[in-house]
């Protein structure tokens, strides 16, 4: 099981404001879809509500303190249960936000797919601080949206120091 964080953020690590993403980059959405299709995605309730529907061709797992029995979504109350269910569906588990969910899974992640967007926007939701010395950049692709005049970069990082593994019970059932 590999846990990967996937996120796009502007300067100051802004990932959202008022439950919305403060930019619209089609290539980033395409990148997100290409990376996550066929895999498990874990998100918080607010992220799910901002998307408004389950993401197609993925196992959608929503972490929430108050499950509401959402159709076509698996709701869980903790990261251990999220990982247990997700690992039965796919080898790579993508953590897609929001802020609190990224914070919970960052110590467990072995890979990060980040889109750094070179714009300043106001935000109330942020990607967590992370220690760059714990990670190695595997790839970087610098891009520009000519219609919006926005520069951005797709980055892929792998953790270089050992990280916390969460051991699942051997007799766990999904």
Locations of regions flagged by a protein language model:
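Enzymes that bind and transform nitrogen-containing heteroaromatic metabolites
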Residues: 1-162
């Amino acid at each position: 099981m590999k846990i990967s964080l996937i996120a796009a953020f502007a300067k100051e690590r802004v990932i959202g404001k008022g439950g919305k993403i403060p930019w619209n980059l089609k290539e980033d959405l395409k990148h997100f879809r290409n990376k996550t299709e066929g895999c498990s995605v874990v998100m918080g309730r607010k992220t799910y509500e901002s998307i408004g529907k389950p993401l197609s061709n993925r196992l959608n797992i929503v972490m929430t303190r108050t499950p509401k029995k959402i159709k076509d979504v698996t709701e869980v109350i903790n990261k251990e249960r999220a990982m247990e269910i997700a690992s039965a569906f796919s080898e790579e588990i993508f953590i897609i936000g929001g802020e609190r969910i990224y914070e919970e899974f960052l110590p467990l992640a072995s890979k990060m797919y980040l889109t750094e967007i070179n714009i300043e926007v106001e935000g109330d939701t942020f990607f967590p601080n992370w220690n760059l010395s714990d990670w190695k950049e595997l790839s970087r692709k610098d891009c520009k949206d000519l219609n919006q005049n926005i520069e951005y970069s797709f980055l892929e990082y792998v953790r270089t120091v050992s990280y916390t593994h969460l051991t699942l019970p051997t007799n766990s059932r999904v």
